[in-house]
Amino acid sequence: MLNTLIVGASGYAGAELTAYLNRHPHMNITGLAVSAQSADAGKLLSDLHPQLKGILDLPLQPLVDVAQAAKGIDVVFLATAHEVSHDLAPQFLAAGCVVFDLSGAFRVRDAAFYSQYYGFEHQHPDWLDKAVYGLAEWQSEDIKQAQLIAVPGCYPTASQLALKPLVDGQLLNDAQWPVINAVSGVSGAGRKASMGNSFCEVSLQPYGLFTHRHQPEIVTHLGTPVIFTPHLGNFARGILATITCRLKAGVTAQNIADAYHHAYQNKPLVRLYQQGVPALKAVVGLPFCDIGFSVQGEHLIIVATEDNLLKGAAAQAVQCMNIRFGFPETQSLL
């Protein structure tokens, strides 16, 4: 059994993560923590998330002393704000813990990226170099050796899973950048109340045009430029990405299907549509990314869907943990 501490368990992704780990046969949850200043400190997780009543009636402890909290801990999950993960991860790593960070604090190795897109100066370039990007279907060998796994963002997960087989297979025409239009549910903004996320205010609206931090994350790890436009949708959870591309001359629909099949035939958490494209309702509450496409001449449209809290966060973190420790990849997820 691996002793596990979850920091930031009070949030949406943190609660989903805790539920997955609670039913994992090789994980022992030794504590749930929140920041010392959190208004949730001292409350039961099940008081904040009533669906967990009778399942996870565990207290949320204020994290005051990291060295003390790390004693006897094998694995730490950080479902915390970017700046918080930036500060906490090196301390847990120094204590010998394996850390899975769901924030963006270690996803990109260029330290200048963080001051530009996250608003803080990165102080741990050594861990930026050592961190492994946890796109589970593509980084499994590196994940097996890593001490710090940076779990990808929600939009980058769907976007890269949809595009990477085609980019790596050199099937796309470089003269036209892939265009990613993606819509996310409101849970992607977290539990903290705000006017823009309130029931009567939420509509369907693009945001972060040319400035969203997930665009350079996608470009860095995909290895090709893209145009990315996120949208906030008036639903609770899920992401649907519609991606338009231009194919190289002579590339057929069968070539696209073959590339996806080759990439994901042994990847149980990516589901490929032989016909048609996926709908959001088929993935909400499940750990999958579903992918479908349509071709007309040299034009390709891909649709990828996922639950932003699961494959876009908690489920992928557990998937990475399973890979890291040699457990079945879907353990506790299916």
Curated annotation (Swiss-Prot):
GO-annotated biological processes: L-arginine biosynthetic process
The organism's place on the tree of life at top rank: Bacteria
EC number: 1.2.1.38
Pathway: Amino-acid biosynthesis; L-arginine biosynthesis; N(2)-acetyl-L-ornithine from L-glutamate: step 3/4
MF terms in GO: N-acetyl-gamma-glutamyl-phosphate reductase activity; NAD binding; NADP+ binding
Residues annotated as the enzyme's active site: C154
Keyword Lipid metabolism applies: no
InterPro entries the UniProt entry points to: AGPR_AS (IPR023013), AGPR_type-1 (IPR000706), NAD(P)-bd_dom_sf (IPR036291), NAGSA_dehydrogenase (IPR050085), Semialdehyde_DH_NAD-bd (IPR000534)
Gene Ontology cellular component terms for the protein in this record: cytoplasm
Catalytic activity: N-acetyl-L-glutamate 5-semialdehyde + phosphate + NADP(+) = N-acetyl-L-glutamyl 5-phosphate + NADPH + H(+)
SUPFAM superfamilies named among the record's database cross-references: Glyceraldehyde-3-phosphate dehydrogenase-like, C-terminal domain, NAD(P)-binding Rossmann-fold domains
Role, per record: Catalyzes the NADPH-dependent reduction of N-acetyl-5-glutamyl phosphate to yield N-acetyl-L-glutamate 5-semialdehyde.
Family: Belongs to the NAGSA dehydrogenase family. Type 1 subfamily.
Name of the protein this chain belongs to: N-acetyl-gamma-glutamyl-phosphate reductase
Organism: Yersinia pestis
